[in-house]
Curated annotation (Swiss-Prot):
Its cofactor is Mg(2+); Mn(2+). 1-deoxy-D-xylulose 5-phosphate binds at K137, S163, E164, S188, H211, S224, N229, K230, E233. PANTHER family: 1-DEOXY-D-XYLULOSE 5-PHOSPHATE REDUCTOISOMERASE (PTHR30525), 1-DEOXY-D-XYLULOSE 5-PHOSPHATE REDUCTOISOMERASE, CHLOROPLASTIC (PTHR30525:SF0). This is 1-deoxy-D-xylulose 5-phosphate reductoisomerase. The gene is dxr. NADPH binds at T25, G26, S27, I28, N53, N136, E138, G217. Mn(2+) binds at D162, E164, E233. It catalyses: 2-C-methyl-D-erythritol 4-phosphate + NADP(+) = 1-deoxy-D-xylulose 5-phosphate + NADPH + H(+).
Length: 407
């Protein structure tokens, strides 16, 4: 049984939905709070969490009368308590408090804590059978099989909040699993779509941060430029929808209007379209199984005029090939892929390596990990976190020689 509900069940909706937002002060959290703000009669806030932004967290807690808030940075606990003095909001700090937020009795949970730190709080929500809007990629990339099996066992409902996976989620409802031929994830191609590989190698940080369509954080914008983000999305789609690598294609679509497509056995292709605005997939998750009014701009296809497509270039973007390789290898390889990429991107931002070295460091780390015979099925959150830690250390150790080769 899948934890992703591919058939709409109208009986699942309730009049007033209690909501928890894990990562309320980040970009996804901000978009979620924007939607909650627009429909106060539909939602009640149970819990909110943040990493270290006390001011923003306290402000949200007061605005939405949150019952519980948690700050991950324990050094900020006293400041948070002082900011909420005189309110009825309970406060907590540290990893255990963030996990408690996920475990509290909310109907719907936005899992938007970034990094491996988001895995255990999301699992806390999953274990009590909540509706979980999943925006944390580590839950799937680092622990996909384990996470989805645990969700299905608990009767949790996993709602994909990422734009591409949400598009597939909507399109997959048009047929049955045995009728599916393939899913197609679209990619803008990023700022280097038409660049020569030699020029991409030398790309600067400023150039990598000029995304043509989306406004995102620094890390994900660089991942888009390298197409590592699309590799991560391929991995996520595999675990979310129980797909083999051969059932997942990537198609470059520079306009970012079609977010995902599904081909069925009768050769019908069902697509989801929309303006590039993260609030649209979040609104779909927040309203599910109903639809709520969203704030995104109305899609005007006549004004856009033309939608174009092209195959991805694996020479320009080797990170995409490595994602498929790691997915086929399995047994923790996707965790290594993600961890090595995070180390590589941080090194690029710090000026320690060239842009082209990002994929080389990921490949070197994967090869080193496979040679070491470390492949093993991940059966717990701690297993995933351990592999993530080992991979980061190996990537950091390999970094100097990768940087030297590129110089």
């Amino acid at each position: 049984m899948s934890a992703v509900p591919l058939r709409n069940n109208k009986a699942a909706a309730s009049a007033v939905r209690s909501v928890t937002v894990l990562g309320a002060t980040g970009s996804i959290g901000d978009s979620t709070m924007d939607l909650l703000r627009a429909s106060p009669e539909r939602y009640r806030v149970e819990a909110l969490t943040a990493n270290g932004n006390v001011e923003a967290l306290a402000k949200l807690a007061k605005e939405f009368s949150a019952r519980f808030v948690a700050i991950a940075d324990t050094s900020k606990f006293a400041e948070l308590k002082a900011a909420l003095a005189g309110t009825s909001t309970e406060c907590g700090a540290g990893e255990s408090a963030v996990i408690e937020a996920g475990a509290r009795p909310a109907d719907w949970v936005m899992a938007a804590v970034s990094g491996a730190a988001g895995l255990k709080p999301a699992l806390a929500a999953v274990d009590r059978g909540a509706h979980v809007a999943l925006a944390n990629k580590e839950c799937l990339v680092c622990a996909g099989d384990f996470f989805m099996q645990r969700a299905a066992k608990a009767g949790a409902c996993i709602l994909p909040a990422d734009s591409e996976h949400n598009a597939l989620f909507q399109a997959l409802g048009s047929g049955n699993r045995d009728e599916l031929v393939r899913v197609i994830i679209t990619a803008s191609g990023g700022p280097f779509r038409t660049w020569k590989p030699a020029d991409i190698e030398q790309a600067t940080l400023a150039q990598a941060l000029k995304h043509p369509n989306w406004s995102m954080g620094q890390k994900i914008t660089i991942d888009s430029a390298s197409m590592m983000n699309k590799g991560l999305e391929v991995i996520e789609a595999s675990y979310l929808f129980a797909l083999s690598p051969d059932e997942i294609d990537v198609l470059v679509h520079p306009q970012s209007i079609i977010h995902g497509m599904v081909e069925f056995s009768d050769r019908s292709v069902v697509a989801q379209l929309g303006s590039p605005d993260m609030r649209t997939p979040i609104a779909h998750c927040l309203g599910w199984p109903d639809r709520i009014k969203g704030p995104a701009a109305k899609l005007d296809l006549a004004k856009i005029g033309q939608l174009t497509f092209e195959a991805p270039d694996f020479e320009r973007f080797p990170g995409l090939r490595l994602a498929y390789d790691s997915l086929r290898t399995g047994k923790g390889a996707t965790t290594v892929y993600n961890a090595a990429n995070e180390v590589a991107v941080a090194a690029f931002i710090a000026g320690k390596i060239r842009f082209g070295a990002i994929a080389r460091l990921v490949e070197a780390t994967l090869e080193d990990w496979i040679r070491g015979g470390n492949q093993t099925p991940l059966t717990s959150a701690d297993d995933a976190i351990s592999v993530d830690h080992v991979a980061r250390n190996r990537a950091a150790a390999l970094l100097p020689q990768i940087a030297l080769k590129a110089s």
